[in-house]
Structures are given as structure tokens and as C-alpha cells.
Amino acid sequence: MIKLTKRQEQVLQLIREHIEETGYPPTRAEISNRLGFRSANAAEEHLKALAKKGAIEMVPGASRGIRLPASETQNQGIPIVGQVAAGYPILAQENIEEYCELPPSFFTPSADYFLRVKGMSMKDVGILDGDLLAVHRTTDIHNGQIVVARIGDEVTVKRFQRQKNKVLLLPENEEFEPIEVNLSQQPLDIEGLGVGVIRR
């Protein structure tokens, strides 16, 4: 059993709550503000102590590079995201319908969540209405890959094609038109890479 100081327990609980509420970990500055530390450096020291004790894992060089151990996150399984509420992060608790008991490592790269597919725009690659698309959270995307993209409050599954300051989100169904996004005029967020499909 991991033994933590009272302050370390507070930091760990804040990390868990932040991930549950938003889908991603807090920054050092957010931890400092919430717990009344004088600086982000104080939060960093507590995070290093938690990592040394095995309570968290840290990813070097990332402002939100805090992970809960796989044993803790895999107990629930992979979250299934249904209708994405406008203005909420994709893994906000409001969007999670249930959990699937498959381990994230079932997919390569590992799946961070399932997105319940709506519509038939990707049917020609076997992604059908109601399927669960396994998604690996990353913004490192290459042309030709299938991605989960957010345009404003809309979330869509399409094939990614970057052309200078423009992105084409391509369907795999001739009945649907490509979505063209001018990056200088419209925000586009990549919510992850499609890494597999299951049908239940």
C-alpha cells in the first residue's frame, strides 16, 4: 500500500477529480491555484514525490503530462462517449455513457475511449452507425488517417487530409461531401486517432 502525506493525498485527489470532470489532468499552475501553493514549483515537488511512490506517472515535457497508473484507470475499462455536449471536453463525465471492460492495450496504439458512431459517412471502411470507434488521444496526425475531429460544437469521424492552411475531412461514402476547414478562419480540434472498431 502506498503511504502518502496529507498534502500528497490532496494533490492526488485533485488530479483524479480533474480527470473525471474534464477528461485530462490539471497543469501545475492549476494545482497550485486550487490548493493554494505559492508557485507551480511547489506543485511540481509534490508531483515528483507522488511519481516516486508510484501513485502517478509523469510524461516529461508536457504541461499536462500526468497519468494515473494503468492499474487504476483500467479497473473501470474504456469509457464509451455518446452524444458530445456542446462546450464540454470530449471525456467530460457528461458525455460518458458507460465503460467497456476491454483493456486499452487491446488496441495499438492503446485506446483512451470509444466514440459511438452516428451516421453512415464512413461505411465504405466498415465504420457503421452505432459502432464503437476506439480512439487514441493524440494530435500527431498524418494525412490519410481516420480521426475524430471537433469543429465548433460538432464532433465527426473522417479521413484527415491537410493542404497548407486548409484541412479536408473526407467521408468514406460517396453520398457524403467532404468537409473543408480553413484553419485561418475556423478552429479545428483533433480529438484523437481511430485505432479500431467494435460492434455490439
Curated annotation (Swiss-Prot):
Residues 28-48 bind DNA. The active site is at S121, K158. GO terms for molecular function: DNA binding; serine-type endopeptidase activity. Belongs to the peptidase S24 family. PANTHER family: LEXA REPRESSOR, LEXA REPRESSOR-RELATED. Homodimer. This is LexA repressor. It comes from Hahella chejuensis (strain KCTC 2396). The lineage of its organism: Bacteria, Pseudomonadati, Pseudomonadota, Gammaproteobacteria, Oceanospirillales.
